[in-house]
Amino acid sequence: DEILLASRLDAREADVGTVEDVDLIGLAAEECARVDADLDVSAVPEGLEVRGISKLLRRAIRNLLENARRYSTGEITVQVLRSGTLAEVRVCDRGPGVPLDQRERIFEPFYRLPGASERSGGVGLGLALVRSIAGRHNGSVHCEDHAGGGACFVLRLPLARAK
């Protein structure tokens, strides 16, 4: 499933869904409910919409949550906020974190952190797909330290234009 999606995203002209205004808070809430993650939208008093393909954005958030669940030893928190002209989804965990020198490599297809092969699940495509989906939406994704231990994956997407 992920390999097929990755190949379709590589062929950028491939039809992978309809572009529409997507309620990012609603999408994040649904995905957080699936894995019992805490969602914080306190920084966004009103809705937050991005222009994109709903099923791809859902997959990006789901992959970030599944990655956090796979490596975390504690709670997973998701924060959705506005940062200028961008929407930001921050998925933070209490896992071992990601060494600074690995923070770009983890987004390469099939790359896994040393020692990760012993953990259950995953083939090393999830984060590569997130980066590809972000790029298709003129956005970005990166990894940073989580205060108190762990990692935060930050997905940034352009906000939909006001109607």
Kindly label every feature range from the protein language model.
Residues G126, V130:
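Short alpha-helical Gxxx[C/S/T] motif in the catalytic ATP-binding
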Residues D93:
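Acidic ATP/Mg2+-coordinating residue in the GHKL
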Residues V98-F110:
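Short conserved segment of the HATPase_c
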Residues A11-G17, E49-G52:
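Conserved micro-motifs of the catalytic ATP-binding
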Residues Y111-G121:
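Glycine-rich ATP-lid/hinge loop adjacent to the conserved G-boxes
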Residues E75-T85:
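Short beta-strand/loop element within the Bergerat-fold HATPase_c
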